[in-house]
């Protein structure tokens, strides 16, 4: 595994829409492993492929230590409620803001074995899933920020 360089705001790759993963290869699996290591090293709870310079629909989320959710071609299939909470981003260091996100989401994705699964979450997990999927569509949390936090 290798720690990857995290792309910072201002790099145009963060504003591009990622392409779906057509086939899961050993390189895809290695990218997932490297993204997990990079996310943990940066003390984050999520990381999307464009944040490490890769325009593919891949993300990892870990809001509970040791419980990594690997997402390949994720799609939000259901959402409910609303929450306004503080968010940050590894690509936008030292900047925080309150965003409005769904309170609960269900996401369908594939895992590293190519198996389709669904994950549902509320509160922090819902925010993290939405945040990472936004990255795959070229969106940053500052785009939906309703209030900056000093």
Segments the model singles out, each with a brief description of its role:
Residues 1-150:
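Positively charged
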């Amino acid at each position: 595994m290798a720690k990857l360089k995290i792309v910072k705001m201002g790099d145009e790759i963060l504003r591009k829409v990622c392409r779906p993963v057509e086939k899961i290869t050993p390189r895809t699996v290695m990218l997932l492993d490297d993204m997990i290591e990079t996310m943990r090293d940066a003390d984050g709870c999520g990381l999307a492929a464009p944040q490490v310079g890769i325009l593919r629909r891949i993300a990892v989320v870990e809001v509970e230590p040791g419980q990594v959710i690997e997402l390949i071609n994720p799609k939000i299939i259901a959402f409910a409620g609303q929450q306004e909470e503080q968010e940050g981003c590894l690509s936008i260091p030292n900047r925080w803001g309150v965003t409005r996100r769904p309170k609960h989401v269900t996401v369908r994705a594939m895992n590293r074995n190519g198996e389709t699964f669904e994950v549902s979450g509320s509160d922090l997990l819902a925010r993290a899933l939405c945040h990472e999927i936004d990255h795959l569509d070229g969106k940053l949390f500052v785009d939906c920020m309703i209030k900056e936090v000093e």
